[in-house]
Amino acid sequence: MMAKPNGKIQFKNLQSHGVLADPDFPKRTWKLLKTAMRQIHQQNASNLSFEELYRNGYNMVLQKHGDLLYNNLKKMVDKHLKAVAKTVSESIDEKFLLELNSSWINHKTSMLMIRDILMYMDRNYVKQNNLSSVFDLGLYLFRDNVAHCSTIKDRLLNTLLSMVQKEREGEVIDRILIKNIVQMLIDLGVNSKNVYIEDFEKPLLLKTSSHYQAQSQTLIQTCSCPDYMKKVEICLKEELERVSHYLDSSSEPKLKEVCEKQLISNHMRTLIDMENSGLISMLKDDKIEDLKRMYNLFSRVSDGLNLMKDVISSYVKEIGRGIVMDEEKTKESGTYFQSLLDLKDKYDNLLQNALYNDKQFIHSIQQAFEYFINLNPKSPEYISLFIDEKLKKGLKGVSEEEVDIILDKILMLFRLIQEKDVFEKYYKQHLAKRLLLGRSISDDAERNMIAKLKTECGYQFTSKLEGMFTDMRLSQDTMSGFKTYIQNLKKALPIDLNVHVLTTGFWPTQNTANCNLPREILLCCEAFKSYYLSNHNGRLLLWQTNMGTAEIKANFPSKSHELQVSSYQMVILLLFNDQSKLTFKEIADQTGIPTIDLKRNLLALTNPKNKILDRELPSTTSSTTTTTTTATSSSTSTSPSSSSSSISTPTPSKSIDESDVFAFNTKFKSKLFRVKVMAVVQKETPVEEKETRDKVDEDRKHQIEASIVRIMKARKTLEHSNLVSEVIKQLQSRFVPNPVIVKKRIESLIEREYLERSKQDRKIYNYMA
């Protein structure tokens, strides 16, 4: 409803005078009022006495002539507005709206004056008879006689729509004039906006829809996706400006809906699928601004973000699947996992800078990563290997803050691994090597990683890892006591022995065949065993020669070197103090080293980088020379030895064959005095993979059974499907149990009388205390 002027004519000390019954009073008084109202309509009211006019109107109502006054007013204004409508209709071109606006302003002003004159009638007669007020009556009459005049109504609509269209096409229009006309339509609805809605808003929305339908079809065929979106942004901005300048605010959501439907909703799929510029192209080329623009536009319409989210998720799955199934990338665990980290960084950046960290996109992309990272059964091993590489040398020279960031990134992908128990197996193996070989770049970094795993998976997950650190600390104390013990005996050992005492349950120990250690080594081992068992009665020591290292002195013709080798390599090299050359079988028989481990260590010793041994075919002949090797220390056991040995010339080979013959490399040279010769790191053999998997499966059986018992102990009675669901829910932080395996473990527990089937329903289990 229009805002009515605050100014009113004030009548002070007005008194009612007795009026004698006069049959001509109504007619005479109306004539006087009518003349005054005509002058008001003609904008010639300066000489009128409004106090006298008010008194006449007051007396008319007082003398019960309110109906006459009201009806005559209606007729007079009606007649006047018909003349106004004729004048407006006759105006041409651009003068049409100006004339209409002028007539409207004059009419409002006139009706305000007339309202003040007939104020008493408004407050009494009109209110008592539930009629429209004087001013509202004027609005209704203007609506019916002018705005809805047959020669004005359609012309008014067409003129307004034409002006809006011209502005859309870039022309400058009189926004203030349109605003006044729009306000007129709003005012003519009195207490509603029906006139504005029916006469202008609805046709405007239809016109807007057809305009942008045509424009969008043209743009979608001629523009790239980014260019189209930029033009859409401009269109939407201009439409909002239109609302603020001359439309009613209630039109904004309706206008937005129409524009967004034609410009966005109807073309979402086309925009996404545009070749070389659509959503996939933006993702490939990291078009952050374009992706952000698409998010902003698609967020305006129903299902826009869902469509965008699904396409991104499918694309991420496709790219991730390509990485985890790429044979070249999976050959190197570092390359494999770094590719996944790079992909994660890329989409974390996209989420933050283009998608406003929208939770539904975060969840969708995370699900995509979880999908493809678990396609490769080796992912748990590769994550552990990647961490192993970082904690050995990849974090060297990096600040604590940067280390924390890198470990957190790794942990983000670790969370997505379903087989966390498999990861734990490999992590224990790799951590054991780092600790025993002293390869960790930082004890703090190791503990930081374990703390993060503990936060992520709980104490049970890391308790054995923490136990490994405890063993390392206690071993230092044990060795300190052992050295004091030897000193007190006043009998020096032939080598500097360092032993790590490992708790079987914590470390990934193996039931390997005992290696045939030299006599001097065995002497040292027995001395340590005697000391240890005297302090820890009832314990059993099993030597893990495969996990040890040694430092031995090797005398080559050119110079002497200190070799850092594994315990197996030490045992192999010491054989050449007594023999000139040895076949693979002879080395195997004399050392007792398992074939797989023997091949790995011989491959390391014949590696061109640090070629300590030569290989030759059985028929090859060679000259000989003499060298001496002396063992100086070992993590588990070592033995000194000194004697001559004949060695053969080298024969290149990339793999160890059981027919190979080995000899000491007299031509070995190195700029370094201390030469590190460690076993060649190879991927697990199929047999080793099966052993690891069997261990994991066996552990899972126990964990599933423990979970079943815990649940049934608490619930007492439970239906099969509910029990399986609860077991999966309880264990999914470590691995996702196969329902078939869960069923087998339930049956095993029934056989062992932990559970029983209900007699009423065999699908229901009861806990047996």
UniProtKB/Swiss-Prot annotation:
Covalent link Glycyl lysine isopeptide (Lys-Gly) (interchain with G-Cter in NEDD8), residues: K713
Any one GO molecular-function label of the UniProt entry: ubiquitin protein ligase binding
Superkingdom as given in the UniProt entry: Eukaryota
Post-translational modification: Neddylated. Deneddylated via its interaction with the COP9 signalosome (CSN) complex.
Subcellular location, record wording: Nucleus
GO CC field: Cul3-RING ubiquitin ligase complex; nucleus
Annotated region described as Disordered, given as residue ranges: 614-655
Name of the protein in its database record: Cullin-3
InterPro entries with a match to the protein in the record: Cullin (IPR045093), Cullin_CS (IPR016157), Cullin_homology (IPR016158), Cullin_homology_sf (IPR036317), Cullin_N (IPR001373), Cullin_neddylation_domain (IPR019559), Cullin_repeat-like_dom_sf (IPR016159), WH-like_DNA-bd_sf (IPR036388)
Pathway the protein takes part in: Protein modification; protein ubiquitination
Major localisation: nucleus
Compositional bias ranges of the Low complexity kind: 618-653
Purpose of the protein: Probable core component of cullin-based SCF-like E3 ubiquitin-protein ligase complexes which mediate the ubiquitination and subsequent proteasomal degradation of target proteins. The E3 ubiquitin-protein ligase activity of the complex is dependent on the neddylation of the cullin subunit.
Keyword terms of this UniProt record: Isopeptide bond, Nucleus, Ubl conjugation, Ubl conjugation pathway
GO biological process, one term: protein ubiquitination
Source species of the chain: Dictyostelium discoideum (Social amoeba)
